[in-house]
Every structure is written in C-alpha cells, then in structure tokens.
A protein has these predicted regions:
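ABC ATPase C-loop
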Residues: 148-149
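The feature captures the beta-strand-to-loop junction immediately N-terminal to the Walker
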Residues: 36-38
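Walker B catalytic motif
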Residues: 160-161
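ABC ATPase NBD coupling module
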Residues: 69-84
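H-loop/switch region of ABC-family ATPase nucleotide-binding domains
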Residues: 191-192
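A short, surface-exposed alpha-helical micro-motif characterized by mixed small hydrophobic
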Residues: 197-199
Length: 237
C-alpha cells in the first residue's frame, strides 16, 4: 500500500478555474519522488491540495494517506498524521529565534542543533539569532529545511527547496534530502533543477497543463520534460 495516493484529482481555484486536471500519483514509504514540469503546470497547486491548503476546491478524485481518505481533512489534521510541506517562500517567524522556532518542531535540542549543521548552519552562531529580517533568504530557506527535518514527518513535500540557494549549495541540499529519508521521511520533491532531480529521485512524474503525462526513471522523465520545453535548469549553470 502506498503511503500517499492521489487518484484522478481535479482541483479548481475559488473563481472556478481548473488548475489540476485529473492528476494521479503515488509515493511509497521511504521513497523520494520528483515532480517536475514547466511553470504554471499545476505542481504547486497539487502539492498545496495534498497538504490541505485553503483556496482550492477538489471537484473530483481523492487524496489518501496511510490508507485513509484525507481529501476533506483540514491541514492541521494532516500534519498530525505526519504530512507536511516546506514552502517555496519560507515564513519569516518574526519575534522568534532560530532555536525557539526549531523547539516548536522537536523537543530534542541535540537533534535540532544537528539539523542546523546538516543544512549548513552553525548552531553556535544561529541558535539565538532572530528569524525574519535578521536572516537572508537563503538562511531562512535552510532554517525551514532544518525545521521540517527536525519534525521527522512520514512524508514531506519540498516545493522548490533550491530557491534562494546558490548552486554551490546543491550538493548540501541533496545530502539534506537523503538525511530526511534516513530519518524515516518519504519525500515528494518539486524542482526545476535537473541535476537535483536526477541525483536524489527514485522515480519522477512529469506534469504539464494540470495533468500527469509521464512517470518513470528520473533521467528519462527529465529528458522528456526537456524535449517538451519544460524549463528545467542544470545545476552547474
């Protein structure tokens, strides 16, 4: 049984615009699955629907997690079940220090500090620093990744985790994703970075115009995406 199963999902925005048009995918326990495709193909909307964000309406299909139909569950109940997401634009968490933010995610301070090290931040330097304007966009992204890792969710959706990071950080990011797997998390990775997708993904889905149009080995799916003008970038660029 798949950990996550999305069946024939159709999703509309509040104004009735159809964004996801019959998408289906699965993620198994401990698996890293890429979701790639051009901008505007519906990837982020599909991800937000999976975790239960408001602003979208499921008009057909279902989302199942751990064998349970969660299509109509609110986001906080999905989070309690072990389903979470790292956003493309991380929150600022004004007024909290990095340590306070991570303490919301785990009671194990040693593990939280280790998570900071894994994402490339020295806990001695960052633990007592305030979030928000005191951190650069790249630093906020790293803190967000550390927080998600600290929670040890069953499934984490990473929406463009390389956004705001320089290309020299890609190897570190791959290690972060692999560490998430080692700690028991399956990963659904949304990315435009072909090197990252090929390096960490076990399988890949290609989404275009609101539909899943291909599934298979990441290298094969990346190639098809490039042939279709999917807008992927090379990590070395």
């Amino acid at each position: 049984m798949a950990l996550l199963e999305v069946k024939d999902l159709r999703v509309e925005s509040k104004d009735g615009t159809e964004i996801v048009r019959g998408a289906s995918l699965t993620v198994d326990e401990g698996e890293i699955v890429d979701l790639i495709g051009p901008n505007g193909s519906g990837k982020s909307t599909l991800a937000k629907t999976i975790v239960g964000c408001s602003g979208y309406e499921v008009v057909e299909g279902e989302v199942r997690f751990k064998g349970r139909d969660i299509t109509d569950l609110p986001m906080y109940e999905r989070a309690r079940m072990g389903l979470t997401m790292s956003w493309q634009e991380p929150a600022r968490f004004e007024g909290l220090t990095v340590g306070e933010y991570l303490s919301v995610c785990t009671d194990d301070e040693d593990w939280a500090r280790r998570c900071l090290r894994i994402v490339g931040l020295d806990p001695e330097e960052y633990w007592d620093r305030e979030c928000g304007e005191n951190l650069s966009g790249g630093e906020r992204k790293r803190v967000e990744l550390a927080a998600v890792m600290a929670m040890r969710p069953n499934l984490v959706i990473l929406d463009e985790p390389d956004a705001g990071l320089d290309m020299s950080s890609m190897e570190d990011l791959a290690k972060v994703i692999e560490t998430m797997r080692e700690e028991g998390s399956a990963v659904l990775l949304i990315t435009h970075n072909r090197d990252l997708a090929e390096q960490v993904g076990d399988r890949a889905y290609l989404m275009m115009d609101g539909k899943i149009v291909d599934e298979g080995d990441p290298r094969d799916v990346v190639l098809k995406c490039l042939m279709c003008g999917g807008g992927l970038v090379c990590g070395a660029e």
